[in-house]
Structure formats: C-alpha cells, structure tokens
C-alpha cells in the first residue's frame, strides 16, 4: 500500500514526530474536541449555503442550517453528543449542573456560538456573488511515491481559468511565529492541485472567522 499523508498529519510530524506516531501509526483514540467539532459544524453550514439560490444566501438562512447540520454530525459520530452533556464549569455537584444548565441550553449556546462565526463570514464575503467551482473538494496526488491527499474547503475558478483556494479557519489568526503552519497547509493543497489539474492556484486565501480577517 502506498503511504498517504494529509496536511494535518504532515504538520503533526513537523511539530512532533511522536505526536504523528501516536495518531497515525499507533492510532491512539482521542476524545472529541469541542473546537474541532465547532469548526466542522461551521464548515458544513458554509458549504451547504451554496445549495440555495444566490438571492437566498443570507446570514439568517445560513444560521438556520446549523441545527440540521449539527444533528447530522451527531448521527454520524454519536460521541460528539458528549460535548454538550455533563456538569457545567464551576458547578459544585451534578444536581446543581442540571439546575444551572440543561443539555438543551447547552445546545442553544453551542449553536449560537457557531452562528457568530457564520455572521462574521458575511462581513468578509458575500455568497450571493460567489459560485464556487468546488466545495469540500477531495484532492489526491502521488508525489515521489507518497500519496498527498486532503479536502479543500472551497475552490473558485475565474472565467480565465485562474484558481483561488479558500480555507475557513475558526481558530484565531496566528502570530507570525505560527503563521507558517497555516501557509504550509495551503501550499500543500496548491501542490496537489497543480499535480492533478496542471494549474498553479493564483490565490491561496485563509479566512479567519473568529477574528474576521482574510
């Protein structure tokens, strides 16, 4: 079997080879991450909104997609439901947690937090004026005996054939010290697209939804 590598796993290896071993070779189980789940939820809504006719791609319509997308994610990965259950921070007893906050309250707060990222996106881009060529595009290419693969959040193609690769980030925009990790991921995608399409992307665009920066 030809070895395969995604940008996130390549980043793991560069950051810490032992972390790479735990995740890829030993496959040690990891509990669900609230940050990762929130990112997946927001990404899903920003992907699905383009199924709507352009005039209907509003902030309200996109936020309305969140409950259904969250239900779908939980159905696919039931362990995600554990992120919205259990004692609240600061509660002195399980009973107090139940009084202080129910699971329904947690879900409403969770969805509202995700909605904040969606609303920020609309201050940066207008989906009514966009028609992506691809969304959540799986890309794969073999380079020097190694399969490089991953998912591109959005691929825009201009009438003259120029490519723009867009990646949504729900974390904070990194300092210069850590910016290289995000740029590495984009260069990874650019290499794979060049190998598969014969075109080097003209623009690699990171969209930071927490800070509202591009």
Locate the predicted segments by residue.
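Mg2+/Mn2+-dependent nuclease catalytic core
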Residues: 137-214
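C-terminal, charged and often intrinsically disordered regions of DNA end-processing helicases
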Residues: 1-36
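Short, hydrophobic/amphipathic alpha-helical patches that form generic packing surfaces
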Residues: 19-24, 43-51
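Hydrophobic (often cysteine-bearing) scaffold residues that line and stabilize catalytic clefts
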Residues: 34, 38, 42, 110, ...
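A residue-level signal for conserved active-site and pocket-lining positions in enzyme catalytic cores
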Residues: 16, 42-43, 114, 154, ...
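Short conserved micro-motifs on helix faces and helix-strand junctions that flank
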Residues: 13-14, 40, 150
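Short, polar/flexible loop-turn hinges at active-site or ligand-entry regions and domain interfaces
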Residues: 26-35, 51-57, 175-178
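A non-catalytic, helix-rich entry segment at domain boundaries
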Residues: 45-135
């Amino acid at each position: 079997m030809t070895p395969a590598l995604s940008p996130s796993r390549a980043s793991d290896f560069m950051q810490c080879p032992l972390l790479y071993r735990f995740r890829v070779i030993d496959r040690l189980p990891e509990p669900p991450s609230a940050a990762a789940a929130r990112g997946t939820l927001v990404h899903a809504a920003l992907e699905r909104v383009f199924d709507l006719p352009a005039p209907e791609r509003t902030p309200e319509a996109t936020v309305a997609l969140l409950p259904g997308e969250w239900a779908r994610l939980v159905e696919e990965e039931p362990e995600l439901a554990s992120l919205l259950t259990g004692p609240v921070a600061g509660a002195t007893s399980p009973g107090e947690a139940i009084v202080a906050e129910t699971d329904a309250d947690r879900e409403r707060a969770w969805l509202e937090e995700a909605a904040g990222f969606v609303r920020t996106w609309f201050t940066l881009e207008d989906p009514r004026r966009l028609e992506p060529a691809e969304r959540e595009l799986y890309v794969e290419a073999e380079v020097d005996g190694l399969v490089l693969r991953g998912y591109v959040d959005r691929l825009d193609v201009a009438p003259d054939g120029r490519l723009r690769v867009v990646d949504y980030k729900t974390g904070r925009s990194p300092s210069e010290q850590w910016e290289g990790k995000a740029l590495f991921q984009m260069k990874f995608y650019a290499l794979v697209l060049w190998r598969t399409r014969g075109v080097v992307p003209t623009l690699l665009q990171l969209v930071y939804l927490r800070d509202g920066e591009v």
